[in-house]
A protein has these predicted regions:
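Positively charged, small/polar-rich N-terminal and surface patches that mediate targeting and assembly
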Residues: 2-7, 13, 54, 276, ...
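N-terminal "arm"/small-domain region of PLP-dependent enzymes with the aminotransferase-like
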Residues: 1-53, 59-62, 354
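Conserved small-domain helix->loop->beta segment predominantly found in fold-type I
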Residues: 262-321, 340-348
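Conserved N-terminal alpha-helix of the aminotransferase class I/II PLP-enzyme fold
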Residues: 33-83, 88, 104-111, 350
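Short, well-ordered beta-strand elements within core beta-sheets of diverse protein domains
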Residues: 243-252, 299-307, 354-359
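Conserved PLP-enzyme active-site core in the AAT-like
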Residues: 2, 12, 72-273, 278
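PLP-dependent enzyme catalytic core of the Aspartate aminotransferase-like
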Residues: 119-121, 133, 253, 318, ...
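A common structural junction motif
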Residues: 231-232, 319-328, 373-375
Length: 375
């Protein structure tokens, strides 16, 4: 594992000068097929784009360096990464997952994985006693999301990893909100890290992707890789190139994202129309001490809950001018979303909640926009 700091790794990992030309920016290899010998022997290590190409391999090297893993795989989306991993489990596998989590993960557990005989078990991952009770029976996998979406719960990765391993589970951590610039779950005991690279890795709201980073290149990693190559949910080379380019500015962007989030959260925490601010950087947050221990900074995602319920939340969202009402997160622009309105017929998010992705605008402009929207 490299001794360099994550910000340095983000700039250099996967960006070695091109061997053929000396170019300091990596080329994009768009070829779908590669020349092989008469008997099918691979002459340069590649055969068909679905099974690998040089651009994706550069991104894989960057991901391994940033998360400190032995193996990494890139996918067409974060959902493809999650589905490929979970569908690699055998029938009858029991999977512990968080009560507050990404809607797409919840949909997999509710609609698709039970068809394969996989048994999902929902638990509050911030409650170690509840997790300990759920681990009384053997588990195949324990899924962590911290900070969580959209309530920004903080889970103790090291403690959960110990409980999961004692129950026989592979421990997976969704590190999308934090990125390896702020948090490195493998170093805390997790076995696999999952990312929607669409978010902070891409960083510009213009490229879809997902990734898995494995602490060890073990049998499960090889099974997932085989499934990826056969089922074809791979990341396209141009998407890999855009994501790799995003890596180079990840450290600078995350620093500004976090600074802006602190300014926004501090302002909102004293506003009379705001009932609750969910951001782990606030000392009043129930997970603040854990976040301070396992994170370098507290991230740029937060949510607020307003006095006046759904109507007040929608009114405030509609009055914003610098913030854009849109889904997703991690781009340069600040976004706001009434999550309950986009979660379908049976939303889990509170009706009074707005999720906020704090972008890279001037912090003063963001605070002023929130001030005028809240009145």
């Amino acid at each position: 594992m490299s001794t360099r700091q994550p910000g340095t790794l983000a700039v250099h990992a996967g960006h070695e000068p091109d061997a053929a030309t000396g170019a300091v920016a990596p080329p994009i290899h768009l070829a779908t097929t590669f020349r092989h010998g008469p008997a099918g022997e691979r002459l340069a290590g590649y055969e068909y784009q679905r099974e690998g190409n040089p651009t994706n391999d550069r991104l894989r090297e960057a991901l391994k360096a940033l998360e400190g893993g032995e193996e990494a795989m890139t996918f067409a989306s974060g959902m493809a990464a999650m589905a490929t991993l979970l569908e690699s489990l055998p029938a009858g596998a029991r999977v512990l997952f968080p009560d507050d989590c990404y809607t797409g993960l919840r949909m997999l557990f509710a609609e698709f994985l039970p068809e394969r005989g996989i048994v999902p078990i929902e638990v509050d991952m911030a409650d170690l006693d509840a997790v300990r009770a759920a681990c009384a029976q053997p588990l195949a996998m324990l899924w962590i999301e911290t900070p969580s979406n959209p309530l920004l719960k903080v889970c103790d990765i090291a403690a959960l990893a110990a409980l999961g391993h004692a129950a026989g589970a592979v421990v997976v951590a969704d590190n999308t909100f934090a990125t390896p610039l702020l948090q490195r779950p493998l170093a805390l005991g997790a076995d696999i890290v999952m990312h929607s690279t669409t978010k902070y890795f891409g960083g510009h709201s213009d490229v879809l992707g997902g990734a898995l980073v494995f602490a060890r290149n073990d049998a499960l990693a090889q099974r997932v890789a085989h499934r990826l190559h056969v089922t074809g949910g791979v990341m396209a080379p141009f998407s890999a190139w855009l994501t790799l380019r995003g890596c180079r500015s990840l450290g600078a962007r995350m620093a500004m994202h976090c600074a802006n989030a602190r300014a926004v959260a501090t302002f909102l925490s004293t506003h009379p129309r705001v009932a609750r601010v969910n951001w782990p950087g606030l000392p009043a947050h129930p997970g603040h001490a854990i976040a301070a221990r396992q994170m370098r900074d507290f991230g740029a995602m937060l949510s607020i809950q307003l006095h006046g319920g759904r109507d007040a939340a929608l009114e405030a969202a509609g009055r914003l001018r610098v913030f854009t009402n849109a889904t997703s997160l991690g781009g340069c622009e600040s976004l706001v979303e009434h999550r309950a309105s986009v979660e379908g017929a049976h939303p889990r998010s509170p009706q009074d909640l707005l999720r906020i992705s704090v972008g890279l605008e001037d912090a003063g402009d963001l605070v002023a926009d929130l001030a005028q929207a809240l009145g």
